[in-house]
Amino acid sequence: HEAPFYGLHVRLTQLIESHERDLDKLFDFLTEPRRAVDCFPALFKREIGPESQGLATGETLAHLNCLLGRRRVEKHRDGDGVDWYRQKPETGDFD
């Protein structure tokens, strides 16, 4: 908001690389079915308290949806309407 911003391309590259690292960490974490809230430790370095739960859930779901779109994970909705995510297996279904 005052001085012009310089270094846009460098900063964009840094952001993309950071998100790709986070996606890889999340993918590695999904070796077993997990809910979005179970994935917080893969993405956040600190404990997520009630005041940050909404933002953390939104950020986690965005990463999970990206992995879904890339067909790296799959989602299963259980009988209670809870979504569970895991790495997409080579073969087979959710147990």
Residue ranges and their predicted role:
Residues 1-29:
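Divalent-metal (often Zn2+) His-rich catalytic cores of metallo-beta-lactamase-fold enzymes
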Residues 24-95:
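C-terminal regulatory/interaction regions
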